UniProtKB/Swiss-Prot annotation:
GO biological process: arginyl-tRNA aminoacylation; glycyl-tRNA aminoacylation
Name of this chain's protein: Glycine--tRNA ligase beta subunit
InterPro entries in alphabetical order: DALR_anticod-bd, Gly-tRNA-synth_bsu, Gly-tRNA-synth_heterodimer
Keyword Transmembrane helix tagged: no
SMART domains noted in UniProt: DALR_1
UniProt cross-references to PROSITE patterns, sorted A to Z: AA_TRNA_LIGASE_II_GLYAB (PS50861)
One Pfam family, short name: tRNA_synt_2f
A GO CC annotation given for this chain: cytosol
Length: 688
């Protein structure tokens, strides 16, 4: 089988930087899928992406589809010809569908008789004839939320398309994609190298782009270059660059030939909280801040230019000039905000609506204050500090700094609280109330902060569910899924002795008559328990394990987690499968029971197997009670695993539905006790 390398490049206007990597990887995945569906073998598909291009390269792509042997069975010979030996309509219709005459059909002898059959070999198409359609479909299926048209064209894409290049080895593929004729023309850098040049082979692409067009098309190569140079520049300044993965990807998506440079700002700006300065540098300017070895912000930053002049002074000064007004604004807002205490901003919260039916932000802070105090009392935190932090929790939303730099909410509250002389735990809680902000984010460190964070999240969950506005589909305007998962993480990972029903009930009481959903407690608890599924699945825990625990509906998250860990461990034991099947059988038997089931009477047992099981379940019931009380579910299930042999023996040797009612009742009681032992942890009958 002969192969060639295949290249496809789509040259565009500047693509959205935050979406570039996703578009490129999706393009490659789509091409892989299309090649597989076409039956075309290949070694691998590589992807390339720069601000003005998406490209894929399929290495070792077969030059043709493989031939296919087909065999279409027709009617039986007895039904294919009439008494005169002429083909019947059924035979003629089948032959016509195969593109042959009845006389051309072969015969297939089977033990059930003889049949007409059509055998043929369908030659595979040359790969080059399929490539235009493969790329067109791959582009059509990209995850593009908003498409656009350009010029007088009817085609749509994420940005206007100017060039399309498809090479299969050294052959330029003819055709049109997105209204653009395929050509051997590739566009270079906007300002460096050749603006436009031609290539003659798929393997020339990367080298020609770099040498002629001054473009590094390999996204990962540009990313690695930016990272290495940034770290090198930061080290030269005696610091460490703050390079977040998402920002690094975005910066990589903004440049075709990266030039990493450093610039500085006036040291007087360091009097402003570092978070505000960093917000401006990262969010607005896409700069990388630099910190010293003690974690203090340095008056320098790293930026990446898309041009590479011999003297970069003008570029450096230009970036310093651009960032200076933003830092000056931050300095002004900070100094202005310090003139008023956080507590004095409480009345202004009355002018901001949290939700029309649920009142203002001032109403919300009053509820957070009360609920945070309740939670603090339960988890051993300082109640007064939790209430104080709850009261001040939203005051920084009324400051100039947070109004201008919204992502600094919480952290600015912490700085202003410190300036006001608030207790340190109170100040820190104002920042940590929003944790975790995203999946994998750190949790609040102090119990006071945990109290406020949970109070805030439960207030939102209870309030929104209480007015019947639960999330639907992907719509979740109040981020309830994040609030639920964040709450669960705090309770579980901090091992807090909190009950969801209790928290929702207390939260609901604080709304007075504002809530209209009478089932708010059950609705919120069910919603939160449902979030466990996604959490544990991400950890690789089997769905049936989660379902087994959900069936018991434990409402204390730390307890729920302990049960999941225990069942996940139990599932690995040799006896697990047999005991799960036995529990399923027990459930079915008990569901059909036609007598009242009481306590086990050991003296009423007749068969040795039922005596053995009765003794085992009664003994274990006593033995595991202390473990259940302490939540040591793994130890409980380890002990219950010993029931496999007596359970198997019972079902092999004992008829449960005996004719004697007393005997039947006692045997059902044994099974009921057996089931009850496991149900104290989970419904293991649901394990697959």
């Amino acid at each position: 089988m002969t192969t060639q390398n295949f290249l496809a490049e789509i040259g565009t206007e500047e693509l959205p930087p935050k979406a570039l990597k996703k578009l490129a990887t999706a393009f490659a995945e789509n091409v892989e899928n299309e090649l597989n569906q076409a039956g075309l073998s290949f070694e691998k598909v590589e992807w390339f992406a720069a601000p003005r291009r998406l490209a894929v390269k399929a290495l070792g792509l077969a030059t043709a589809q493989p031939s296919k042997k087909i065999e279409k069975r027709g009617p039986a010979v007895s039904a294919a010809f009439d008494a005169d030996g002429k083909p019947t309509k059924a035979a003629e219709g089948w032959a016509r569908g195969c593109g042959i005459s009845v006389e051309q059909a072969e015969r297939l002898a089977t033990d059930k008789g003889e049949w007409l059959v059509h055998r043929a070999v369908i030659e595979g198409q040359p790969t080059k004839n399929l490539l235009v359609d493969i790329i067109s479909r791959s582009l059509a299926n990209l995850p593009i939320p908003k498409m656009m048209r350009w010029g007088d064209k009817t085609e749509q894409f994420v940005r206007p398309v100017h060039t399309v290049t498809l090479f299969f080895g050294g052959e330029l593929i003819e055709g049109e994609i997105l209204g653009v004729k395929i050509a051997n023309v590739v566009r270079g850098h906007r300002f460096l190298g050749e603006r436009e040049f031609t290539i003659s082979h798929a393997d020339e692409y990367l080298t020609a782009l770099r040498e002629k067009g001054s473009v590094i098309a390999d996204f990962n190569e540009r990313k690695a270059l930016i990272l290495a140079k940034s770290q090198e520049k930061a080290t030269a300044l005696g610091g460490v660059a703050d390079i977040e993965e998402d920002l690094l990807d975005e910066v990589t998506s903004l440049v075709e030939f990266p030039n990493v440079l450093t610039a500085k700002f006036e040291e007087r700006f360091l009097a402003v909280p570092a978070e505000a300065l960093v917000y401006t540098m990262k969010g607005d300017q896409k700069y990388f801040p630099i910190y010293d070895k003690d974690g203090k912000l340095l008056p320098h930053f790293i930026f990446v230019s898309n041009i590479n002049p011999e003297d970069p002074t003008a570029i450096i000064e230009g970036n310093e000039k651009v960032v200076r007004p933003r830092l000056t604004d931050a300095e002004f807002f900070f100094k202005t905000d310090l003139k008023q205490r956080l507590e004095d901003r409480l009345p202004r919260l009355e002018t901001v609506l949290f939700q029309q039916q649920l009142g203002t932000l001032r109403d919300k802070t009053a509820r957070i204050e009360a609920l945070a105090g309740e939670i603090a009392a339960q988890i051993g935190a300082d109640k007064a500090k939790a209430e104080r932090a709850g009261l001040l929790s939203k005051c920084d939303l009324m400051t100039n700094m947070v109004f201008e730099f919204t992502d600094t909410q919480g952290v600015m509250g912490m700085h202003y609280a410190r300036h006001d002389g608030e207790d340190e735990e109170v100040a820190v809680a104002l920042n940590e109330q929003y944790m975790p902000r995203f999946a994998g984010d750190e949790l609040p460190k102090s119990l006071v902060a945990c109290s406020v964070a949970l109070a805030d999240k439960f207030d939102t969950l209870t309030g929104i569910f209480g007015i019947g506005q639960a999330p639907k589909g992907s719509a979740d305007p109040f981020a309830l899924r994040r609030a639920a998962l964040g709450s669960l993480r705090i309770i579980v990972e901090k091992n807090l002795p909190l009950d969801l029903e209790d928290l929702v009930r207390k939260s609901a009481a604080l709304f007075g008559d504002k809530l209209t959903n009478a089932n708010v407690v059950d609705d919120v608890v069910d919603f939160m328990l449902g979030r466990f599924r996604a959490w544990y699945q991400d950890e690789g825990i089997a769905v049936d394990v989660i379902q087994a625990v959900l069936a018991r509906r434990p409402t204390r998250p730390a307890d729920f987690d302990a049960r999941v860990r225990a069942v996940s461990h139990f599932r690995t034991l040799d006896s697990a499968e047999a005991l799960a099947a036995a529990n399923k059988r027990v459930s079915n038997i008990l569901a059909k029971a036609d007598v009242a089931i009481g306590e086990v009477n050991p003296t009423a047992c007749v068969e040795p197997a039922e005596k053995a099981l009765a003794e085992a379940v009664l003994g274990l019931r006593t033995e595991v009670q202390p473990l259940i009380a302490k939540g040591e579910y793994t130890a409980v299930l380890d002990k219950l695993a010993s029931l496999r042999q007596p359970v198997d023996s019972f079902f092999d040797n004992v008829m449960v539905n005996a004719e004697d009612p007393a005997l039947r009742q006692n045997r059902l009681a044994i099974l009921n006790t057996l089931q009850g032992l496991f149900l104290q942890v989970a419904d293991i009958s649901l394990l697959q």
